Amino acid sequence: KAEHVVLRSRYSVLRLKKNKSLISRLLFEGAEKFQVKVYNNSLNSNHIHLLVKAPSQKNLHDFLRFLAGQIAQRITGAVRGKKNRFSFWLKPVWRRIVHWGRDFVNLHRYIYQNQLETLGLIAYQLRDRKPHLFERAF
């Protein structure tokens, strides 16, 4: 099944010119390496939305570890295995299963809306939604 994945950074640095191309390259490099189909993505200043499908949970897990780890290391200059004083990512990766049909189409629209808002082509629109259980804990 397809999944909606959100990676949220502690810092608003993901859309900086030098980081945009790096993240796009890592996204598609990881997708190819771990056989993950990326249906849609939105790179925002402090978070990334992905609509993806993987052949197995292991592939998706490995892809997300690769992507999150490489982005954090490349942007902060952190070295793997060396303790850092801070975490680049604000929260753990958020995921939910996306059902085919209306759910899939609505998520495509939502990610597209994020892309347009990020580019400044449309005004930011407040989301009227209930917080997820994950968000209530913080």
Predicted feature locations:
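Short catalytic/metal-binding and nucleic-acid-binding patches
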Residues: 1-138
